[in-house]
A protein has these predicted regions:
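NAD(P)-dependent aldehyde/semialdehyde dehydrogenase
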Residues: 9, 15-157
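A short, charged helix-loop
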Residues: 1-7
């Protein structure tokens, strides 16, 4: 809730890089209750040229139509949607968000849901969390799903 403009811009990159389809793309954010979601839209705005891609635009139009026909509440800026949703996965051109009131309860939820989460980005210097803008830049030892792929392959030989 106290991110700088630069941190929000880096978060926006984590959201839209690879059209949001990267295995480590940010598909959901947790924000403090009362958070101004327009700050997220502001950080995303430089990526409005995504609509120049026919495939992205088709996904945006399709998902928006599905949401509107289903009478879901959503926030929309003309090229990207924010939807309050408990799911960790979101479709192209959409970011799920969830409000929280207690940071300790949020950490507990993230720990409990660890198997559903590929990676966590945050402005906190917390073990296992990546800085905003670094989700798609893992280190050699940042194995997918925390599983050491090389050790697994060695077992097979």
């Amino acid at each position: 809730g106290n991110e700088t403009k630069e941190q929000l811009e880096a978060l926006a990159l984590d959201i839209v890089q690879y059209f949001g389809l990267g295995c480590r793309s940010t598909s959901k954010i947790f924000v403090p209750k009362g958070y101004d979601l327009n700050l997220i839209f502001g950080a995303l705005y430089p990526y409005n040229s995504l609509m120049d891609s026919a495939k992205y635009a088709n996904n945006y139009d399709y998902n928006k139509a599905v949401y509107l026909m289903s009478l879901f509440d959503l926030l929309d800026n003309g090229f990207f949607m924010l939807k309050e949703d408990a799911s960790y996965t979101s479709p192209v051109a959409c970011l799920h968000y969830e409000f929280y009131e207690d940071a300790q309860m949020l950490e507990k939820k993230l720990t409990e849901d660890n198997d559903l989460i590929q990676c966590i980005t945050s402005n906190q210097n917390t073990t296992g969390h990546f800085a905003f803008g670094k989700a798609q830049q893992p280190q050699l030892w940042d194995y997918a799903d925390g599983k050491n792929t090389l050790a697994f392959l060695n077992i097979l030989t």
